[in-house]
Amino acid sequence: MKIKHIFLFFLLTLIGACSDNSKKDYDLIIRNGLIYDGSGNAPISSDIAINGSFIALIGDLSNSTAKKEVNAEGMAVAPGFINVLSWATQPLIIDGRAMSDIKQGVTLEIMGEGRSMGPLNESMKIREKNRQSNIKYDIEWTTLGEYLDFIVEQGVSVNVASYVGATTIRVHELGYEDRAPTSDELERMKQLVRNAMREGALGVGSSLIYTPANFAETDELIALVSAAAEYNGRYISHLRSEANKLEEAVLELIKISSITGAPAEIYHLKAAGKKNWYKLENVFNLIETAKASGLRISANMYTYAAAATGLDATMPPWSQEGGHDEWVKRLKSKKNRDLLSEEMLNADSDWENFFMQAGPEGILLTGFKNPDLKKYIGKTLSEVSNLRGTS
């Protein structure tokens, strides 16, 4: 079998990296691999010696032996990959092996973009329990730290870390109401962030196109990120807009970083909708200008012209105020459906209108909770509309 580019992964602590021609014995030697060390430097062809869980040496090990040897000729050797936007929060509960990521070389899952697995109050636990689909589990934790302890104690192959979700903090105190927190509520929200940081959270994560996250004003986010910054926490964000108001959304993130002093990272940076593609150059300039001023601003992105989200992102925020049950109740009203249709067909709406950015021909349906609808998986929204005789 011809192997063009197979990756061999390691996540070990580097304690030596020099050539050694003396005779030594190791637990493991990986020979002749093309080493990508994660620094961005050009790869080097070399050997790697491992003792226990540590890299003992990188270099010429032709005179050394090991209990086990791997010939990595023609293969690449790299540190374990980091999934910076992991939604394995629930799958890891029922199967800690994480095989879908482990087999791709991922060794660290970072969660908490907007929503996190804690802190939870009793009503949040009931709501989460009622909304479980194929993955069923008991919620045996309350705080984010307790969730992380739970999956580690249960057994998990990957390393895990999490931001505390700004949405989770908001729902904990305000539910799904579209309003600003009172001063007392905001103080409790800040304290929840501090508690999460003491439990090991990386910082605060937001996902501002989704309800109820988009009910939060900038000042609310500044307050939460400031609390995280007391513990050297970071801020990550799915921006408030990735389309018509992309530049304004980037400036909001820069403002939050500037006021709080927290490093900030834009998650899956993009310009959604062809009419907005030209904005990326200006966004790059905004980021570089902020960095030149001393702010620690970064971004990550994926290299394809698509996105994945829920159909809730195609409907205006007002329709979802109050949570899932209130949203469904509104959809049962013909008056509301007519109003929704009118707003969804407005390409210049104030909210992040993914329906118009992609169009019904560009929206691919990939999952349903209702078994009767699973037959539509893999079809576009336009195809399903034609099959059902609806619009």
Q: Which stretches of residues belong to each language-model region?
A:
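Active-site neighborhoods of metal-dependent hydrolases
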Residues: 148-151, 156-183, 189-210, 221, ...
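C-terminal motif of bacterial Sec signal peptides marking the signal peptidase cleavage site
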Residues: 15-17
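Metal-associated gating/positioning segment near the N- to mid-region
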Residues: 72-142
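Short, acidic/polar
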Residues: 90-98, 185-195, 249
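Histidine-rich, glycine-flanked metal-binding segment
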Residues: 22-28, 35, 39-80
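Divalent metal-coordination and catalytic microenvironments
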Residues: 33, 53, 74, 85, ...
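Sec-dependent signal peptide recognition
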Residues: 2-9
